[in-house]
């Protein structure tokens, strides 16, 4: 159900322009990332149970850096970094927020949340992307985007609350 909600959300676009403005290749890349994520989620949880969160985070950051370095070298168009307050804040955000803090929070979540729940929460990523675009960038929601958000929320709530309700009734 959440997958249908994401599809409706993507199809909505700005002013209901829809799928014409969306790259099919980009959507396939996101779908591939989701499939890979689902495939390694349980394995990652088992690894984190055997090693410390700090060790796992360190290895993840180093391996992530090594595997993305060739793409960075090939795809970077401009190597100029503005050494002003905005440029330095951007570098700090990328170094701390998107790297270290993101991995640390992810590993803390893996230690405390069941793999099934974390898999469901991944469906909320596009929803938060849209909400941040609306609140921070002043984007507007189309009807189909709002419908997609509603379906994603209902699927997420249903998959997390329904097992608890069924467990109480038994």
UniProtKB/Swiss-Prot annotation:
Q: Where located?
A: Cell membrane
What residue stretches are annotated with the EamA domain? 35-161
Q: What is its main location?
A: membrane
- Which ranges does the record mark as transmembrane? 21-41, 55-75, 86-106, 117-137, 143-163
A Pfam family this protein belongs to? EamA
A single GO CC term for this protein reads: plasma membrane
Keyword Membrane found? yes
Say which family it is in: Belongs to the EamA transporter family.
PANTHER family found in the cross-reference section: EAMA DOMAIN-CONTAINING PROTEIN, INNER MEMBRANE TRANSPORTER
The molecule here is called Uncharacterized transporter HI_0976.1
Organism of origin: Haemophilus influenzae (strain ATCC 51907 / DSM 11121 / KW20 / Rd)
């Amino acid at each position: 159900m959440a997958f249908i909600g994401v599809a409706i959300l993507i199809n909505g676009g700005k002013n209901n322009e829809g799928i014409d403005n969306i790259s099919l290749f980009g959507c396939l890349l996101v779908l591939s990332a989701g499939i890979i994520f689902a495939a390694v989620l349980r394995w990652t949880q088992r690894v984190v149970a055997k090693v410390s969160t700090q060790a796992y985070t360190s290895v993840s950051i180093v391996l992530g850096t090594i595997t993305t370095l060739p793409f960075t070298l090939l795809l970077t168009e401009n190597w100029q970094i503005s050494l002003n307050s905005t440029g330095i804040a951007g570098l700090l955000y990328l170094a701390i927020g998107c790297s270290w803090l993101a991995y640390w929070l992810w590993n803390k979540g893996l230690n405390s949340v069941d793999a099934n729940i974390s898999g469901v929460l991944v469906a909320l990523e596009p929803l938060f992307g849209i909400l941040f675009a609306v609140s921070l960038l002043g984007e507007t929601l189309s009807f189909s985007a709002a419908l997609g958000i509603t379906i994603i929320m209902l699927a997420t709530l249903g998959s997390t609350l329904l097992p608890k309700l069924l467990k109480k009734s038994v």
